[in-house]
């Protein structure tokens, strides 16, 4: 009987100790993610950066969510920024945020507790300019110590989201498909 009580007591202590020492936080937040978009045409290259991207990564479920403040993209030229934000293009006053909510489809390929680089596929819904599309993209997750970095590069066809200049110089200066790169860093607690 004493052995049984001793075993139960030790099991309880181990369970409590494990509960308080194991990393239980599975939802991580990045408040300063970076997104760059790049457009190449024969006339000019256009690039813009946004360092105010907020995202979450749930390491237990594989859910990823991104919120992108569209007016926070910074351009080399003020006129580019004006065209980008205008009602004739992205209309960022009406559509102030782009959002993505998705899932890592091969979560079992990632060990968030072991340093390494993992190739994953993320599928979900992208909402941009009031249009929601289902997309599937590849990404790289790097685990190094208590840091987790998620990076992806994809091509985005503007017409899919009803984004286009109807005519004039801006319509010939921006590519129909742009390259979008994203990098978000998360810190594990503990």
Where are the regions a protein language model picked out?
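Positively charged n-region of N-terminal signal peptides that target proteins for export
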Residues: 1-5
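Short amphipathic alpha-helical "recognition" segments used for binding
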Residues: 6-7, 85
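Bacterial N-terminal signal peptides
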Residues: 8-17
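Low-complexity, acidic/polar, glycine-enriched regions of mature
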Residues: 20-190
């Amino acid at each position: 009987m004493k052995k049984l009580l001793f075993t139960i007591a030790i099991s309880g202590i181990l369970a409590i100790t494990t509960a308080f020492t194991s990393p239980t936080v599975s939802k991580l937040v990045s408040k300063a993610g970076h997104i760059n978009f790049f457009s190449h045409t024969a006339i000019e290259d256009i690039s813009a950066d946004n360092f105010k991207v907020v995202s979450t990564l749930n390491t237990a479920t594989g859910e990823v969510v991104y919120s992108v403040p569209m007016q926070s993209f910074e351009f080399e030229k003020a006129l580019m920024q004006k065209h980008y934000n205008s009602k004739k293009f992205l209309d960022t006053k009406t559509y102030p945020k782009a959002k993505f909510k998705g899932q890592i489809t091969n979560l079992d390929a990632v060990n968030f507790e072991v340093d390494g680089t993992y190739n994953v596929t993320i599928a979900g819904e992208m909402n941009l300019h009031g249009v929601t599309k289902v997309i599937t993209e590849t990404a790289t997750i790097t685990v190094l110590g208590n840091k987790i970095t998620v990076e992806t590069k994809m091509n985005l066809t503007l017409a899919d989201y009803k984004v286009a200049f109807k005519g004039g110089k801006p319509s010939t200066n921006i590519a129909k498909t742009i390259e979008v790169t994203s990098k978000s860093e998360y810190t594990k607690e503990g």
